[in-house]
């Protein structure tokens, strides 16, 4: 028994020495102080257990798992994490700034006074346009605003099919710069290049809308009778009629600069119903207007140009007395009751009522339609750029 015990003690002694040496090796080779301390304590606990049984297996596995824990990430990984976070924050800040600039550009259209199509106006073309010959200081500012809003549209949608619109925004016809046709086509705000140009547009170019308006002639004429007055000028215009923009010229608009005028539309249900059925009406664009235009005998509106060549102005004759004349691009024409006349009002034009006072006023119903050669993608982009005020 003693020899057995002695032999046992001899065998156990070297074993403990080996365990102690292994524990010292763990301690000496540890690259991190905290990791080495953890390993030293674990090794000591393992070595101190002389008799291990099956019931000790869970505890041993738990202690052994401490040895296999991953070491801390190196300092370079932490630096990369910080750099990634900084770049992410910078990207989010850039996106915020980009969105803010887009919203400022979209909301500044009407405040800058540059992106407007103007009302129908007594000129049959919408009065002096911003950036046109009567306002030489607006051209560059308007051009820059249109370019910014077009870029905002492209970021939201696409540049596909925007070649002409992009060229128009970058090199719009400022004062005296619009090439036009023989110098008589000078749109004041937007010149869309490569559009077929003629002072008068064939009726077939807008056949559906022309036929719809002409078939609605009786209803539109009744609506005018319901809102008409004596146009004497001795009393203020009744509700819905605009003050005369020129002597002898009055108008009542159902749509003004792309915005519906609800009270006037309710008073003219037949005309409003016809407008709702049109396919090419510029109802969501500041270039789009619709309403009654009245010219009294003796009134004359000297030559001027409309704001853009992207639209065609449709005149439906309601009351056309003798002596009325429309000259567009040097070509004279006259209206006819119940028939439509399509005019490119970006050409220089003049309107006159040379009849006698007994003849009564000349009355036409005017609707702004898209030029038939403006593509659908271009219309969508221009509706975005020249969206009416909310």
From Swiss-Prot:
Residues 1-54, 116-143 are annotated as: Disordered. Keywords: Dioxygenase, Membrane, Oxidoreductase, Phosphoprotein, Signal-anchor, Transmembrane, Transmembrane helix. Coiled coil: none annotated. Residues 96-390 are lumenal. Pfam families: Asp_Arg_Hydrox. The keyword Transmembrane helix applies. InterPro entries: Asp/Arg/Pro-Hydrxlase, Asp/Asn_beta-hydroxylase, IPNS-like_sf. It is a single-pass type II membrane protein. Residues 1-72 are cytoplasmic. Its main location: membrane. The chain crosses the membrane at residues 73-95. The keyword Transmembrane applies. GO terms for molecular function: dioxygenase activity. Its EC number is 1.14.11.-. It is an enzyme of class 1 (oxidoreductase). Residues 41-51, 128-137 have a biased composition (Gly residues). Belongs to the aspartyl/asparaginyl beta-hydroxylase family. This is Aspartate beta-hydroxylase domain-containing protein 1. It comes from Homo sapiens (Human).
């Amino acid at each position: 028994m003693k020899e057995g015990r002695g032999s046992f003690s001899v065998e156990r002694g070297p074993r403990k020495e080996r365990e102690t040496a292994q524990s010292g090796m763990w301690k000496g080779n540890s690259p991190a102080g905290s990791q080495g301390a953890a390993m030293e304590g674990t090794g000591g606990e393992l070595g101190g257990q002389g008799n291990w049984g099956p019931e000790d297996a869970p505890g041993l596995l738990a202690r052994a798992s401490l040895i296999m824990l991953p070491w801390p990430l190196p300092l370079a990984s932490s630096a990369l994490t910080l750099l990634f976070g900084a770049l992410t924050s910078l990207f989010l800040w850039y996106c915020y700034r980009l969105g803010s600039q887009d919203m400022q550009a979209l909301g500044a259209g009407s405040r800058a006074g540059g992106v407007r199509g103007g009302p129908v106006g007594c000129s049959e073309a919408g009065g002096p346009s911003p950036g046109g010959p009567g306002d030489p200081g607006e051209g560059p500012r308007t051009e820059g605003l249109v370019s910014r809003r077009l870029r905002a549209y492209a970021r939201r949608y696409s540049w596909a099919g925007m070649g002409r619109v992009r060229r128009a925004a970058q090199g719009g016809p400022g004062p005296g710069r619009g090439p036009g046709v023989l110098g008589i086509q000078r749109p004041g705000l937007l010149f869309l290049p490569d559009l077929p140009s003629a002072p008068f547009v064939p009726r077939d170019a807008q056949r559906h809308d022309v036929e719809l308006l002409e078939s609605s002639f009786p209803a539109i004429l009744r609506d005018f009778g319901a809102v008409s007055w004596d146009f004497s000028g001795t009393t203020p215009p009744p509700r819905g009629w605009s003050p005369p923009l020129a002597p002898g010229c009055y108008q009542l608009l159902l749509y003004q600069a792309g915005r519906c005028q609800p009270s006037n539309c309710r008073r003219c249900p037949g005309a409003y119903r016809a407008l709702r059925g049109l396919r090419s009406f510029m109802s969501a664009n500041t270039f789009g207007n619709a309403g009654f235009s009245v010219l009294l005998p003796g009134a004359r509106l000297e030559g001027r140009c409309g704001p853009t060549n992207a639209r065609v102005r449709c005149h439906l004759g309601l009351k056309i007395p003798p002596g009325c004349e429309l000259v567009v691009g040097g070509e004279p024409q006259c209206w006819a009751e119940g028939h439509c006349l399509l005019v490119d009002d970006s050409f220089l034009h003049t309107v006159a009522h040379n009849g006698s006072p007994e003849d009564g006023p000349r009355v036409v119903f005017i609707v702004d339609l898209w030029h038939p050669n403006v593509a659908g993608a271009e219309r969508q982009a221009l509706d975005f750029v020249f969206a009416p005020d909310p």
